[in-house]
């Protein structure tokens, strides 16, 4: 290990808080550290929001450290109240197990789990069979309710009501860290900055029970300039699963981020050298679009592979140039019979998720924000038939400047 990975993560913009900064940096500089990041299995795919922590894991592994990807088969049964205004709906064990399996398959694309270079663990293995009384005696005794109630993750829920069910989450996550410490020698937990209180709980538990050093690091959360979490679109989350968010849509999301976020995302979400990150981030005016293209290409390449990244880039450039419609764009296919009768534009927009509702679609159409084959359409009742197809045998629907969708007949 040459350059200390702590300095690398700091320079690239990852690190927000550290429990023991100097000690953590010293530890990472002198030995191979086993660390963990938890993933609660709340969906069947990782999202763009997860990708920042996945990148951190990749950096750490490349520097010679050993990641543990902890799947939350147990904690997902409770649900993390952090950042939630209401209690999560309870998920079935079968759904959680399925989601955890999907996460494991996706993480294997980014992390090398061969030859003990990394570990996949599932906290269902130790949480679901816990003896409640023993847990309270062994773990609960180390937690002050007074102190827990001052934690940010609980404070914002107190007005609406926090169930005892959710109140246990911090103890369970702390218990995870302790189990991983005993089982694998895990000394460091990493997570998003919204996990700070939970991570502190685990660090403190190990130091109390084992009289041994344990550490926590949190990363900044990807947010827009308004402070909203990045990785969301009108269609919902930006997924890493290509069947839920196509490589083209994934590429377009990063191609269209705010100018002020380009340098930050290049540092966090690509492996480009920091000199190149700073050069691209300093571009202004129309040149910033080149930096966005590099960003979108590099992230898509990591997530979906070089071939899909090139296809997405080609499709985006084809659209921008006003050229022929590309086979790599998001596409919806209707039967030829449906086009013979005619399909109204509102239905097409709903099916393509270019609108959240019929009224939303109608509003966009009437306000002149929608075009079909580069012709603005303001009649929301207009129906399209096969004789409206362009020379490429398709309808290209655009909403605004950045949302596109192709429609074809079978």
From Swiss-Prot:
Source organism: Lachnoclostridium phytofermentans (strain ATCC 700394 / DSM 18823 / ISDg) (Clostridium phytofermentans)
PANTHER family membership: TYROSINE--TRNA LIGASE, MITOCHONDRIAL, TYROSYL-TRNA SYNTHETASE
Subunit description: Homodimer.
Record EC number: 6.1.1.1
Gene3D superfamilies: HUPs (3.40.50.620), RNA-binding S4 domain (3.10.290.10), Tyrosyl-Transfer RNA Synthetase (1.10.240.10)
PROSITE patterns, alphabetized: S4 (PS50889)
Catalytic activity: tRNA(Tyr) + L-tyrosine + ATP = L-tyrosyl-tRNA(Tyr) + AMP + diphosphate + H(+)
List of residues binding ATP: 232
CDD domains with a match to the protein in the record: S4, TyrRS_core
Pfam families given in the database record: SYY_C-terminal (PF22421), tRNA-synt_1b (PF00579)
Residues in S4 RNA-binding domain copies: 343-409
Motif ('HIGH' region): 41-50
GO molecular function ontology, one term from the record: tyrosine-tRNA ligase activity
Location in or out of the cell: Cytoplasm
Reported function: Catalyzes the attachment of tyrosine to tRNA(Tyr) in a two-step reaction: tyrosine is first activated by ATP to form Tyr-AMP and then transferred to the acceptor end of tRNA(Tyr).
Alphabetical UniProt keywords: Aminoacyl-tRNA synthetase, ATP-binding, Cytoplasm, Ligase, Nucleotide-binding, Protein biosynthesis, RNA-binding
Enzyme type, top EC level: ligase
Entry binding sites for L-tyrosine: 36, 169, 173
NCBIfam families documented for this protein: tyrS
Any one GO cellular component localisation term in the record: cytosol
Family classification: Belongs to the class-I aminoacyl-tRNA synthetase family. TyrS type 1 subfamily.
Protein name: Tyrosine--tRNA ligase
């Amino acid at each position: 290990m040459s350059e200390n990975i702590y300095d690398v993560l700091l320079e690239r913009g990852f690190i927000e808080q550290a429990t023991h900064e100097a000690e953590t940096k010293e530890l990472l500089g002198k030995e191979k550290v086993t660390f963990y990041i938890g993933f609660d299995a709340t969906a069947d795919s990782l999202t763009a929001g997860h990708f920042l922590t996945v990148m951190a894991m990749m950096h750490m592994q490349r520097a010679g450290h050993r990641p543990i990807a902890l799947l939350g088969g147990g904690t997902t049964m409770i649900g993390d109240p952090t950042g939630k205004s209401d209690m999560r709906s309870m998920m079935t064990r079968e759904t959680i197990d399925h989601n955890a399996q999907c996460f494991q398959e996706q993480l294997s694309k980014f992390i090398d789990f061969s030859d003990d270079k990394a570990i996949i663990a599932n906290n269902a293995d130790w949480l679901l069979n816990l003896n409640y009384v023993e847990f309270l005696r062994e773990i609960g005794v180390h937690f002050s309710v007074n102190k827990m109630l001052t934690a940010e993750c609980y404070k914002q829920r107190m007005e609406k009501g926090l169930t005892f069910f959710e109140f246990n989450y911090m103890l369970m996550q702390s218990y995870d860290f302790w189990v991983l410490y005993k089982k694998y020698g895990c000394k460091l937990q990493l997570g998003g900055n919204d996990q700070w209180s939970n991570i502190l709980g685990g660090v403190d538990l190990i130091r109390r029970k084992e009289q041994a050093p344990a550490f926590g690091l949190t990363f900044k959360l990807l947010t827009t300039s308004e402070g909203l979490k990045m990785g969301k679109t009108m269609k919902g989350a930006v997924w890493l699963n290509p069947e839920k968010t196509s490589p083209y849509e994934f590429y377009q999301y990063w191609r269209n981020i705010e100018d002020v976020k380009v340098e930050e995302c290049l540092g966090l979400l690509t492996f480009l050298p920091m000199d190149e990150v700073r050069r691209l981030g300093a571009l202004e005016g129309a040149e910033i679009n080149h930096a966005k293209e590099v960003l979108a290409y590099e992230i898509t390449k990591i997530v979906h592979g070089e071939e899909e990244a090139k296809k997405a880039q080609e499709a985006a450039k084809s659209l921008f140039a006003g050229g022929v419609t590309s086979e790599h764009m998001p596409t919806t296919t209707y039967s030829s019979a449906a086009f013979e009768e005619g399909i109204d534009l509102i239905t097409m927009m709903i099916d393509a998720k270019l609108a959240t509702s019929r009224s939303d679609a109608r509003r966009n159409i009437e306000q002149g924000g929608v075009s079909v084959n580069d012709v603005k359409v303001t009649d929301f009742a207009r129906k399209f038939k096969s004789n409206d197809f362009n020379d490429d045998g398709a309808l290209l629907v655009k909403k605004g400047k950045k949302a596109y969708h192709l429609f074809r007949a079978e």
